[in-house]
Amino acid sequence: MKRATRIPTRRTTTTKRLAGAVAAALLAFAGSAAAGPTITFGKEGSLTFNYSFQGWAQDRGYTSSTDSGRQTDFFLRRNRLTFSGQYNDLVGFYANVDAPSDSRGGDDDKSIFFRDAYITVDHSDELRFIVGRFKNAFTRENLEACFDPLTMDRAEVMSYTPWGGSRDTGVAMWGNLADGRFQYKVMASDGREGAEVAKDSPRLTGRVHVSLLDPEFDFGYRGTYLGTRRVLTIGAAYDYQKSVAYRDFVGKTDTVDYKAWTADVFFEQPTSAGTVTASAAVMRYDTGKAHFGLSPDPNLPATTDLEGWYVKAGYLLPGKVGPGRVQVFGRHERSEYNLPSGYRDQKWDGIGVHYLIDGQLLKVSFEAAQVKFDVQNPTNPSQRDYKQYTLGLQFIF
């Protein structure tokens, strides 16, 4: 399995740039570990296809917010078809269609939609642009490829911004400086929109990171490089949107701005005794305690004023066990929602193992998790202590 390690700088040969750009697009967002079939057009054009699948079997201590009975569920966590490539030496493109969580909770035959669709313009390694719908440039974990995770998956909530979630529509400028040791991202996007918004202003995001060992060149990251790099990266980001909500929704007064910050660190060190991976982050979303206003906006998400942190670690055994490799992992996270009820505040702990039959292209994973709430909600089983067990199969072509 061949992996691209960096995005090439501008005006390398067309062949090198074409191959590098396709690989970079796949690694940045799809989470695909290798390119699928590629069709070339002329001297500079190309189109690459990818199929990525995650099937889960999950046993959970409740069924829904109204049903406290234990549930066993089989569903498609992710089910994506990706199209990516180059129009010419300067302009590239990427799109994927997805039907996530199909069959989860009895919701079968979900409609597919474009999860990502964007154009890239690569002027140089120091100056690149993305236009369309793509990943938010705020938290590291959201930018980590979902098909290259260290744990079973990302955090269920805290890594996604309240206004935009995992993706948003807009434009980003980014680049690598000092031979990739320093990276910057600047993004302007829709953020919160709609009639309930006090003022329709753009959402502005800025992110930087410093790589002290091997550089992380791509717009996105990986949760683990499976021992192919020595990485120590420190990152930080800020997110802002003006006048996103009213604290007095009925009277349409007392507007509040949205502000958020995050800081993170990622470390991976391969040794003869195996590969150690560790990552941690803290994030704070602040919308002026809008839920505590005179008449709060009923459309505000629960994450409006969320603050939290996580730590996660993994160990990849040095040799094969049978036909594949074994990676064990653990995760702890703490989240406080700052809601009047206090019901959602929680601690989340999980341990698990990946059996990598062909790297990330074909693997089986298992995770056992326990969620404990500070305050037990007497009417909502999803906000009471529970345990969860997940078995997953991942395939990428």
Regions found by a protein language model. Give the residues of each.
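Outer membrane beta-barrel
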Residues: G36-E216, R222-T224, T303-G319, R325-N338, ...
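N-terminal signal peptide c-region/cleavage motif recognized by signal peptidases
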Residues: A30-G31
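Repetitive helical segments and hydrophobic/amphipathic motifs
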Residues: A25-L26
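Bacterial N-terminal signal peptides that target proteins for export
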Residues: A4-G20
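Outer-membrane beta-barrel pore domains
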Residues: K2-R3, G42, G61-S68, G106-D107, ...
